[in-house]
């Protein structure tokens, strides 16, 4: 009887592995939608200014898109597929210089077998702090 149980378990394990239940392959993410930044409003501020509400105009922004200020994601308000807004704090306007502004459309999650979309980042535009 014990030999029969071992044979059944061995056969079941072999069947499961042959059917692919022992491991799964994953599908890599497909490219996401690349956003395009066309304008920053305003595109400059004076050093020492108080916070500035920045409007980023462009195309292909998804509802979870984020504005990146000097490479770091900042709290973003989605207005439409063509417009996003964010507040630039006083500390980021304290000294003169420039800030690269981009937009990232985050990717979608991958399921058990992969898939989803990858995150995509827009072209860069320059915000000037005079």
Predicted features, each with a name:
Residues 75-79:
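Short beta-strand segments within Ig-like beta-sandwich modules, predominantly Fibronectin type-III
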Residues 104-108:
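Beta-strand-rich extracellular modules
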Residues 82-86:
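Short strand-edge motifs at loop-to-beta-strand transitions and within beta-strands
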Residues 1-18:
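Sec-dependent bacterial lipoprotein signal peptides
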Residues 92-99:
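Short glycine/proline/serine/threonine-rich loop/turn segments at secondary-structure transition edges
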Residues 59, 89-91:
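Hydrophobic loop/turn residues within beta-sheet-rich immunoglobulin-like superfamily modules
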Residues 19-69, 98, 109-130:
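Beta-strand/beta-sandwich contexts
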């Amino acid at each position: 009887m014990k030999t029969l149980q071992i044979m059944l378990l061995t056969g079941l394990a072999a069947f499961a592995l042959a059917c692919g239940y022992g491991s799964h392959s994953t599908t890599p993410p497909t490219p996401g939608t690349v956003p395009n930044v066309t304008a920053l409003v305003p595109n400059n501020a004076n050093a020492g200014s108080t916070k500035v509400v920045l409007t980023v105009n462009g195309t292909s922004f998804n509802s979870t898109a984020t504005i990146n200020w000097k490479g770091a994601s900042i709290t973003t308000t989605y207005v439409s597929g063509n417009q996003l807004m964010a507040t630039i704090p006083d500390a980021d306007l304290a000294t003169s210089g420039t800030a690269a502004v981009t937009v990232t459309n985050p990717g979608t999650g991958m399921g058990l077998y992969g898939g989803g979309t990858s995150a995509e980042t827009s072209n860069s535009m320059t915000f000037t702090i005079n």
